[in-house]
């Protein structure tokens, strides 16, 4: 059983007091204080001891200390400069821990690879909820060696990530993430597992990279552009939405026919394979 010495209110409070810190809601900081949740996160991550783990938003290092027991190395990205002394103290105790002080959305894959001593293979994090969805998609897009992610997010974000066609939460984000990966696990985390308790429910999701969704020679960025155009005017038919966002109607009609898609369909009913088919047909005229 993998646990963290900081995963209880007393230990977290004492550490914050030792370094003169208070929680900062502006950065979305709610510290995890439940070892049962940490154990389940580690089980879902299936770390075998040889992975380079990437973490975003380590906070005071509660999850980090658990990951360090199971990974070859852990590289964390933290935006709050006041937490640097805490992470420095952890780095002094663990030779396999490295960290970058910066906004995760600004750090380049090259910076991460340099800090980690190679490309990260697993992403495990209790993510800042305000940027969680963006970070997940960006990391899968820019880090090809990333095999899977196990991330704590707001329940509504987890619903978007795991949504299926026809579901009201299924949208352009879900379809674009589906070009790279799919959800393979999930569990809910109540507010009482954090300090301070957030005013929202949380969930942990496991997302595994899937190869071969987009065929060789078809640009994923173009597929994403097709998805964005299809969802741009969600209440309209896919033909009207896409024609208002850069695609000619006659070209669209030919692509719809080739893919067996009715022009009166709405984007939220189509799966990722349908968008890939559309993009393939439309790429001939791009």
What positions do the PLM features span?
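C-terminal lobe and adjacent flexible extensions of AdoMet/dcAdoMet transferase-like proteins
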Residues: 209, 227-286
């Amino acid at each position: 059983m993998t646990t963290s010495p900081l995963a209880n209110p007393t230990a977290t409070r004492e550490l914050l007091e030792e370094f003169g810190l208070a929680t900062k809601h502006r950065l979305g900081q709610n510290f995890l204080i439940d070892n049962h949740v940490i154990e389940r996160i580690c089980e879902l991550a299936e770390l075998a001891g040889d992975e380079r783990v990437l973490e975003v938003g380590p906070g005071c290092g509660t999850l980090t200390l658990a990951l360090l027991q199971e990974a070859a190395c852990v590289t964390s990205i933290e935006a709050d400069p006041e937490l640097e002394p805490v992470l420095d103290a952890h780095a002094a105790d663990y030779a396999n821990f490295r960290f970058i002080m910066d906004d995760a959305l600004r750090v380049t894959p090259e910076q991460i690879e340099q800090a980690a001593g190679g490309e990260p293979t697993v992403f495990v994090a209790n993510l800042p909820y305000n940027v969680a969805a963006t970070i997940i998609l960006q990391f899968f897009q820019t880090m090809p060696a990333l095999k899977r992610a196990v991330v704590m997010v707001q329940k509504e974000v987890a619903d978007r990530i795991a949504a299926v066609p026809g579901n009201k939460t299924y949208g352009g984000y879900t379809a674009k993430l589906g070009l790279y990966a799919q959800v393979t696990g999930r569990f809910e985390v109540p507010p009482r597992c954090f300090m301070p308790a957030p005013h929202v429910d949380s969930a942990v999701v496991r997302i595994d990279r899937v190869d071969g969704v987009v065929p060789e020679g078809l640009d994923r960025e173009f597929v994403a552009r097709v998805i964005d155009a299809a969802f741009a005017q969600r209440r309209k038919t896919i033909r009207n939405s896409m024609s208002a966002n850069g695609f000619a109607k006659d070209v669209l009609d030919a692509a719809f026919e080739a893919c067996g898609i009715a022009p009166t369909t709405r984007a939220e009913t189509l799966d990722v394979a349908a968008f890939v088919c559309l993009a393939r047909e439309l790429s001939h005229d791009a």
